[in-house]
Every structure is written in C-alpha cells, then in structure tokens.
Regions:
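Hydrophobic anchor at the beta1->P-loop junction of P-loop NTPases
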Residues: 73
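Charged, low-complexity intrinsically disordered regions
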Residues: 1-35
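SF2 helicase/translocase NTPase motor core
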Residues: 31-70, 78-195
Length: 196
C-alpha cells in the first residue's frame, strides 16, 4: 500500500481498458476499488491526537471493522495493530471497548490509548467489574487473560456480559489458551468464549 494512490489509479485505468468478461476478475478488481475508495473516504475522529497519521493498512482495518463487526486483524508484530484496533473502536463509535491482553502489557495499552485519543478513559484490574455504561464517554476496559481462569472468573464474566460492550480487542490471542485451573477445571479459553 506504499504506493496506494498510484496503484489504485493504475488498476482503475486497467479496468477501463480491459475488455475481459471474466466475472472473477471483474469482481476481484471491483472489490479492490470499492474498498480502497471506502478507506480513502474514512474520516479520522476529531479527537485523534497521535503524532503520526494512520497508514493505509490501519485505516483498512477500521474500514473493514465498520463493514464486518467480526473482522480480525492477524497482521505481523510491529505492523500497527494497536493503533488500528483503537482507531476502529472510535470509527464504530464504541463507548465501551474491552481489551483482553497479557498482564505484561496492560499498562502499555492504557498509555497507547491515551496517546491516540486523550479523551479516553481506561480502567484495569478489578475496577473493570464495577464500570457503568456512560454514553458520554469512551471507556476502555483493559483486562489481562489471567483474570479469566480464577475462581471468581465466571461471576465477573457475567457482570461484564450485563454491561453493553460495543467492541472487543483480543491482543496476543494465543495467550487465551492458558492452563485449566485444577481446582475449578475452568480454562481461560472456556471463559473467553462465554464472554464473547
């Protein structure tokens, strides 16, 4: 996408010049053009304060999330997934976003969210389970995966399910596997599925 506009224009011109009746080709190219136009038309929220503008991939993730709420971004590490996830949450106007991540990066998520959208409120730790929905705020509940395999996890998950969660971000989803808690025989993955 580095040369996005140039590529787009070349594809558009090539489509006009092409006399092919190949439906697959027409659909494939048509989808590319439609999605590219949708991404380019995306307006950043006024509250966006991150020093760098999002790249085309990050905008594409936000665009696709708006089109397909179950869209998942499995890009490589370092590709800007955090920015794309936070941006997507605002593009869809999520008032309560649940971020599930490893314990080691809970604070980092909070810092990143504040850097991108300073008007955000974030909560982590046990305070998450007493949050009230407030449509005047953008709230991010940052929960580490370890909270999903504790004795009280099921009761906490039920509290979260009653809260209107608009968007869920699963960071480093491989951490959701966990090991079953021997005493309760409840795994992170099982509790995660109950939450979703």
């Amino acid at each position: 996408f580095k040369y996005g506009d140039r590529t787009y224009n070349q594809v558009k011109e090539g489509m006009k010049a092409s006399k092919t009746k190949n439906q697959f080709f027409q659909q494939y190219v048509g989808t590319f053009l439609k999605e590219y136009e949708g991404v380019k038309a995306l307006q950043l929220p006024k509250q966006y304060k991150f020093p760098k503008q999002p790249n085309l991939m990050q905008l594409y993730v936000a665009y696709k999330t708006k089109q397909l709420p179950q869209f998942a971004n499995f890009s490589e590490p370092g590709s800007g997934k955090t920015l794309s996830a936070v941006l997507a949450s605002r593009i869809i106007n999520s008032k309560v976003t649940l971020v599930l991540c490893p314990n080691s990066i809970v604070e980092q998520w909070g810092n990143n969210i504040k850097e991108i959208f300073p008007d955000s409120e974030f909560v982590f730790g046990n305070d998450i389970f007493s949050v009230k929905y407030d449509k005047s705020k953008y709230q991010y509940l940052i929960l580490n995966y370890d909270k999903l395999n504790q004795a009280e996890s099921l009761a906490r998950i039920n509290k979260l399910k009653k809260l209107k969660i608009d968007f869920i971000i699963l960071d480093e989803v491989q951490s959701a596997k966990g090991v079953a808690n021997i005493s309760s025989k409840i795994s992170r993955r099982t509790n995660l599925m109950k939450l979703l």
